[in-house]
């Protein structure tokens, strides 16, 4: 499956379904959106909660590099201060706090989608 041409797409769907399942089971609105603008700029999941937005990029690789953050940061620039959290969910096991986003294992996708983000909380982007 590592080299299968549909690996990335299937992995992304698995992660989004886990996020959706966690939100529904927690009694939260299932407000997960895919974002793409007219120029092709996209992010895998945009989660709106009131006026706040969390952005998620999903990667099927087991390592993260700087390219993993490019789309995330460009979309965050469009929404400005409304973005309170940027997360890369990937197939690896390590959790990291980078200067521009959090990096979480896909195993935490449900938790990342259900933790409510409020200004000043531990989940707010620095």
Q: At which residue positions do the language-model features occur?
A:
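A cross-kingdom feature that marks ATP-driven nucleic-acid transaction machinery
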Residues: 1-126
């Amino acid at each position: 499956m590592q080299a299968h041409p549909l690996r990335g797409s299937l992995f992304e769907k698995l992660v989004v379904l886990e996020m959706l399942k966690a939100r529904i089971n927690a009694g939260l609105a299932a407000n997960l959106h895919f974002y793409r603008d007219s120029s092709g700029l996209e992010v895998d999941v945009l989660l709106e909660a009131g006026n706040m937005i969390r952005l998620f990029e999903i990667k099927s690789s087991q390592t993260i590099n700087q390219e993993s953050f490019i789309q995330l940061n460009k979309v965050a620039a469009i929404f400005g201060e409304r973005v309170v959290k940027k997360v890369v969910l990937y197939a690896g096991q390590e959790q990291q706090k980078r200067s521009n986003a959090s990096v979480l294992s896909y195993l935490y996708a449900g938790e990342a989608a259900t933790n409510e983000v409020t200004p000043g909380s531990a989940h707010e982007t620095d």
